[in-house]
Every structure is written in structure tokens, then in C-alpha cells.
């Protein structure tokens, strides 16, 4: 298909991109480029503005990043939509959708729902953001209801939009590149039991709950280690846990994907204590390495983890501690759940071309 014949698509998100793109993102946008004439309006990872002809990345100012982004977004969208002559605009949250609707471009507006928009103000950011939660809830609902189409990523997120009277146009996960995790067969569980957490150290990931659970579980698991990988605003919680349990807790701020795959091979299970998840990519990564999950049964986690089949689901921090003790002291249980985890991973795998094809079906009027 020639460039002139491709549908003109504008993607809008507050996502922070770095140029050049990582190999994984490059594959995703290359596949989208086969189907669409794509432009992206997002934010810059390094804080400065960039425009390479496909990605227009706006700069960021400390403390004012969020407010400025949304205040200026309708004007930026209107300008870029006109330049690009966009036939459709896809947003990665209902909040961006409202800004796009205010721009009144005439293009179709499609919302991608990656999670519960109501948690954005309650579990991310400052007390001020939590204070405006009721207003933000209402604004997000307007974005979902007024959009021309809504694409969800899981049964959980589909349920969220149906609860406010909207039927999703499609349900499929965002493209996730699992090549490094599925490239080789899983290895047996390690002889020395260990648990692994991989994620940002933020409120919605319930890092505080993880620390509480490990303090309860560790005395019952002599010689067993919790390995934490991540960085974020709750780092002080992890630092204190490492000080309190230095022989049973390690912390690494950042690993490459290949190193995360290796860390999973060296663990008996993944632990995911999140308070909210739209999907939970790290669960699929763990499953591909044949590692079961001990996780909170919230949001999209329950769409992936089947209690007693490929992991253990819990409802509280105390239950999380008990489940960790149970799995890390019962080799037979761990091996049975590990086998179930590897089988469960297959349903979540997709190629870049397959993802782009499904996006084309949603974008088509």
C-alpha cells in the first residue's frame, strides 16, 4: 500500500518516548507503518522537545508536566491533526480522549483503555491529584462515552466500560514483545527457593504491602531471598526492608530485558502485590520462563492468573505472606504451578503484524 493510500492515523499519549526507539518499539511501529501513515504526539523521556517526522515529542517542565500537558493538548492535537490530515486519532487513556474531543478535529476518536482510569488520581502522584479524584472520574467517563470507539486490553477493562454503558469495539492486549522471554525453553526451578518482584516502586504497585508481607514471611523462610527490581518514589520502603532483612532481601534498580529473564530463571515465583493492574505484562514474562505468580486478585491480574493452576491469588497483604510461605516451602506445588504457567502463556502471544491487523479493524469506520 502506498503512503498516500494508507489511512492517516494520529496516536496521542502522555507516554514518555526516547529516540531512537528500542528494538521492541521499533518493531511495533514498523508494523503499524505497514497499515497506516502514522504520527505520534507524546512526551519526551529526556525532557526536551523532539520531532523526527513520525514522533513529535513535547518537552516537560518539573512539577508542571501533567497540568501543562493536558492544558496544551487540545491545541497541539488540533495543529498536528490538520498537518497530518488525520482520519482517526487513537488515545491511550480517556483523559487524552477528552482533550482530543475538545480539539474538534473532525477525525474519529478511539480510546484505548489500558486500566482503570479512576486509579490514576488515587494511586499515582500527589495528594492534590487524589483530592480531585471525583472530578477526574467524571472526566474519564466522558472520554469513554463520547469516543467513537473504545478498545480494551482485557476482560477486566471491558467490564469497566460496560459498567458505564459502553460496549468495546474490540478487546486485545497492547503489543508486547516477549521474544527474549520465549526464545528458549524454561529451566527447572532453582534448588534454593527465591521470590522475585519486578516493577516500579510506586503506590499502585503496593510496595508497602510487599514489604509488610515479606516481614511476615521471611522468619518462616530461613535462607530464602526476595529479589526486588525497580525504582520509583517508594524507594525508601525498599531501602528500609533491605536494612531490616539484609540476608533475605536484595534490590536492583534496573535490569535489561535479558537480565530480567535471567532473574526469573533464578527465582521460584514472581510476586505481584499490585492494588491495580489493567493487564500485568510481567506475569506473561514470568509464565514464559515457567514461573508461577503469587499475586493480588485485582483488576486484570485475575484475567491472567488462575488460582491453583498457574499461581496463587490473594486478597490482602497477610494472605500474600501466607501464600509466599506456602509456595516457597512446597516444591511439588511450585513445580505443578510452574507447568501451568508455561501453558498459560501461549494465549497472550502476538506478532507485530497481528497487532497491527487488529488495530486496523478498530480504526476502520
Feature locations, PLM:
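Conserved donor-binding/catalytic core segment of Leloir-type glycosyltransferases
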Residues: 10, 151, 187-205, 211-215, ...
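Carbohydrate-associated surface elements
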Residues: 156, 175
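Membrane-proximal helix-turn-helix segments that form the acceptor-binding/catalytic region
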Residues: 28-30, 75-79, 117, 130-150
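Short hydrophobic beta-strand element within catalytic cores of glycosyltransferases
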Residues: 292-295
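Nucleotide-activated donor-binding/catalytic signature segment of Leloir-type glycosyltransferases, i.e.
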Residues: 239-258
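Aromatic "clamp/platform" in nucleotide-sugar-dependent glycosyltransferases that forms part
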Residues: 275
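A charged, aromatic-enriched C-terminal amphipathic alpha-helix characteristic of glycosyltransferases
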Residues: 335-363
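Conserved acidic donor-binding segment of nucleotide-sugar-dependent glycosyltransferases
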Residues: 307-308, 312-318, 326-332
Amino acid at each position: 500500500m502506498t503512503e498516500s493510500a494508507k489511512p492517516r492515523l494520529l496516536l496521542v499519549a502522555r507516554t514518555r518516548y526516547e529516540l531512537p526507539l528500542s528494538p521492541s518499539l521499533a518493531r511495533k511501529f514498523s508494523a503499524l507503518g505497514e497499515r497506516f501513515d502514522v504520527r505520534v504526539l507524546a512526551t519526551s523521556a529526556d525532557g526536551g522537545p523532539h520531532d523526527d517526522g513520525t514522533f513529535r515529542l513535547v518537552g516537560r517542565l518539573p512539577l508542571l508536566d501533567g497540568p501543562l500537558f493536558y492544558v496544551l493538548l487540545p491545541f497541539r492535537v488540533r495543529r498536528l491533526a490538520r498537518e497530518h490530515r488525520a482520519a482517526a486519532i487513537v488515545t491511550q487513556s480517556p483523559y487524552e480522549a477528552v482533550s482530543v474531543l475538545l480539539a474538534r478535529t473532525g477525525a474519529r476518536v478511539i480510546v484505548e483503555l489500558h486500566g482503570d482510569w479512576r486509579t490514576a488520581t488515587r494511586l499515582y502522584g500527589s495528594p492534590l491529584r487524589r483530592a480531585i479524584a471525583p472530578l477526574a472520574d467524571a472526566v474519564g467517563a466522558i472520554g469513554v462515552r463520547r469516543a467513537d470507539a473504545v478498545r480494551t486490553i482485557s476482560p477486566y477493562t471491558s467490564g469497566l466500560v460496560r459498567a458505564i454503558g459502553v460496549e468495546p469495539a474490540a478487546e486485545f492486549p497492547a503489543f508486547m514483545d516477549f521474544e527474549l522471554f520465549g526464545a528458549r525453553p524454561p529451566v527447572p526451578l532453582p534448588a534454593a527457593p527465591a521470590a522475585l518482584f519486578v516493577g516500579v516502586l510506586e503506590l499502585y504497585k503496593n510496595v508497602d504491602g510487599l514489604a509488610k508481607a515479606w516481614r511476615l514471611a521471611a522468619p518462616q523462610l530461613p535462607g530464602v531471598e526476595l529479589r526486588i527490581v525497580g525504582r520509583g518514589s517508594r524507594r525508601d520502603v525498599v531501602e528500609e526492608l533491605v536494612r531490616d532483612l539484609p540476608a533475605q532481601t536484595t534490590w536492583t534498580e534496573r535490569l535489561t530485558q535479558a537480565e530480567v529473564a535471567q532473574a526469573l530463571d533464578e527465582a521460584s515465583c514472581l510476586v505481584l502485590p499490585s492494588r491495580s493492574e489493567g493487564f500485568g505484562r510481567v506475569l506473561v514474562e514470568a509464565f514464559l520462563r515457567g514461573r508461577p505468580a503469587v499475586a493480588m486478585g485485582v483488576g486484570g491480574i485475575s484475567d491472567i492468573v488462575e488460582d491453583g493452576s498457574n499461581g496463587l491469588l490473594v486478597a490482602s497483604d497477610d494472605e500474600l505472606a501466607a501464600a509466599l510461605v506456602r509456595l516457597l516451602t512446597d516444591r511439588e506445588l511450585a513445580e505443578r504451578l510452574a507447568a501451568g504457567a508455561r501453558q498459560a502463556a501461549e494465549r497472550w502471544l502476538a506478532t507485530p503484524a497481528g497487532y497491527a491487523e487488529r488495530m486496523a479493524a478498530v480504526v476502520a469506520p
